[in-house]
């Protein structure tokens, strides 16, 4: 479980008023903000915080430990891709992003090419 705290008293002055996310399952602390001594997003063992007093800080949105979003950006026109399906010899160097990898459009099967076109160009969100 992840909880948020603000350190109100500590032997280490760098911890004073800093805000942390504590992961009790991993015994890790992630710095959200500190005035000095620690960087934002720095992860340390919870035990490295030493002895401290703190107050709870509400986490408005539950953090995602795993998962997330993935975005492929292709700056193309639908007409260009459709023409590349019909006339691959005109576009030997046409490269697109698929699942984070750069791939030559002509190396995809026709079905994969049509799928890329359908997913890349939509009428509405």
Curated annotation (Swiss-Prot):
Any single Gene Ontology cellular-component annotation: cytosol
Annotated Glycine radical domain residues: 5-125
Residues bearing the modification Glycine radical: 100
Protein name: Autonomous glycyl radical cofactor
PROSITE patterns on file: GLY_RADICAL_1, GLY_RADICAL_2
Source species: Aliivibrio salmonicida (strain LFI1238) (Vibrio salmonicida (strain LFI1238))
Taxonomic lineage: Bacteria, Pseudomonadati, Pseudomonadota, Gammaproteobacteria, Vibrionales
Functional summary from the UniProt entry: Acts as a radical domain for damaged PFL and possibly other radical proteins.
Keyword annotations of the record: Organic radical
Record GO terms (molecular function): formate C-acetyltransferase activity
The keyword Translocase appears for this protein: no
PANTHER family assigned: FORMATE ACETYLTRANSFERASE, FORMATE ACETYLTRANSFERASE 1
Cross-referenced InterPro entries: Auton_GlycylRad_Cofactor, Form_AcTrfase_GR_CS, Gly_radical, Glycyl_radical_cofactor_GrcA
